Amino acid sequence: MKNLKLIRVINDYTQLKVQMETGIPQSMISKYEKGDLMPTAENLIILAKFYNTSLDFLMDLTDERTPYPPKSK
């Protein structure tokens, strides 16, 4: 999940900072970023809200960063 690490680095956050803000253990964040573990749906939503970005961006389905939740049409 390259975009998950990318957005963390862009925001100048450490994995520990993300852990403190989201409650997701640093060890899991590391595994998510390396692609060793897929986040649960619940954790994906927590991360999308924290970073204010779409699930598609976090899951590397798009390179276009849009806010979370997506705006209704």
Which positions does each model-derived feature cover?
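Short, charged recognition helix plus adjacent turn
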Residues: 59-73
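Short coil turns linking two alpha-helices in DNA-binding domains
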Residues: 14, 25-28, 40, 54
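Short basic helix-loop element that most often maps to the first helix and adjoining turn
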Residues: 2-21, 46, 71-73
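DNA major-groove recognition helix of helix-turn-helix/homeodomain DNA-binding modules
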Residues: 23, 42-57
